[in-house]
A protein has these predicted regions:
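A short beta-strand-loop-beta hairpin characteristic of the jelly-roll/cupin
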Residues: 77, 81-113, 246, 250-278, ...
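C-terminal flanking tails of non-heme Fe-dependent oxygenases
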Residues: 266, 270-273, 295, 300-376
Length: 376
């Protein structure tokens, strides 16, 4: 008769299954609120993937999303790999090729620094470094922690022969979206957004619209066909900052360029300030207020990678807002005056003047004049 202690089925465990899987890896696993530069993060060999890698468990991911950094050696091609989930890749350094394969069909596209693309679930893919003199470094985003909580078998997710693609990326419309994103405008109260499988340069992306209600920033919203993830590209003019706001967990923020500062804090508790630049990354914890400031001489931009919409949070298009939160945003008229003073002090150190309109601190209904985009 089998002893109770010998049973192999999954039972409740105080440590999440994803965390226990991390303990089996021989690569670094960082637990941080903020990483100053993903481009210089120490990696280690990952024999299974034949590359150097590390996983960053940000405090704000809270079992929702995964952030992984990998490095492709100079001139190398990583072995084919199939992942059960969609995975999203941002290029921190380098240029190369990505090939997505299903049987005899394949799609290859070129990527470069600041490119962003999706590796669709159920397909084999190969990643190649086109540079022979330096490594390429990538940031990967997926929702493995969340799904592994439901399917607590790591082998299910990696090179699983029983998993087949559930959407055809080789149909003419999908293939076209690897070449050029398309704008979608559904009219009504929904704002226009861009749909594609591949975005060549998020640092240079200039198709923006006003981000009304958040201050003077403009933004682009990027979507991926057949998936629930979206990406926001808020862009702040020189000498400005956004309103403090809060939302749910798992939204990874990475900086493509510029110089700035962010602050995060749980309501009623001490504020944590971080100075950022290209390669910095962080994740605001659930229900923590956070606020972003441009301290540089050029417009400041950050990339916000949102987990699947409609599944975790309320709000339209996965805004990750809580329906029961009466104060999801702090108006400039209500913010702690010390925040404004710190912003202006930081600008002074850099010889930059604040361009925040004095009226926005007096009138909560103040309407910004947007120079970075239009509603059209």
């Amino acid at each position: 008769m089998q002893n109770q202690s010998d049973k192999t089925y999954e039972v409740w465990h105080p440590v999440p299954r994803y965390d226990r899987w991390l303990e089996t890896l021989d690569i670094p696993v960082y637990h941080e609120y903020f990483v100053g530069d993903l481009r210089t993060l120490r990696l280690a060999p990952w024999e299974e993937r034949e590359c150097n890698a590390a996983i960053v468990v940000f405090a704000g991911q809270e079992g929702v999303s995964e952030a992984r950094v990998s490095e492709i050696p100079a001139g190398a091609t990583l072995p084919p790999f199939k992942f059960t989930l969609d995975e999203y890749v941002y290029v921190l350094e380098g240029r190369g090729l990505a090939t997505v394969v299903a049987g005899r069909r394949q799609k290859t596209f070129e990527w470069q620094k600041h490119s962003f693309f999706v590796l669709p679930r159920g397909y084999h893919h190969r990643l190649s470094n086109a540079q022979g003199n330096r490594a390429a470094r990538l940031l990967h985003f997926n929702c493995l922690p969340l799904v592994m909580a439901v399917i607590p078998n790591p082998a299910f997710f990696f090179n699983n022969p029983s998993i087949e693609p559930d959407r055809d990326i080789f149909d003419p419309e999908s293939e076209e979206l690897f070449s050029e994103a398309k704008q979608v405008d559904e009219g009504g109260k929904r704002e226009a957004y861009w749909v594609g499988n591949f975005f060549p340069d998020l640092r240079a992306w200039d198709k923006l619209r006003p981000q009304r209600g958040r201050g003077g920033a403009s933004v682009a919203t990027l979507m991926f066909p057949g998936t629930g993830v979206r990406v926001g590209l808020p862009t702040m003019p020189v000498g400005t900052y956004k309103k403090a706001h809060r939302h749910g967990a798992g939204i990874v923020i990475v900086i493509p360029g510029g110089e700035g500062m962010s602050v995060m804090w749980p309501e009623g508790q001490e504020k944590q300030f971080f100075n950022w630049h290209e390669g910095s990354a962080f994740v605001p914890p659930s229900r923590w207020y956070h606020q972003h400031f441009n301290l540089g001489p050029v417009p400041g931009r950050y990339i916000a990678i949102f987990p699947p919409r409609h599944q975790l949070f309320g709000g339209t298009r996965g805004e990750a807002k809580f329906q029961d939160d009466p104060h999801p945003q702090i108006e400039y008229t209500e913010e702690d005056p010390a925040v404004r003073r710190r912003f202006e002090d930081e600008l002074r150190k850099r010889g930059i003047e604040s361009r925040m309109p004095p009226e926005c601190y007096r009138d909560p209904r103040y309407e910004w004049a947007y120079a970075g985009g239009s509603d059209d």
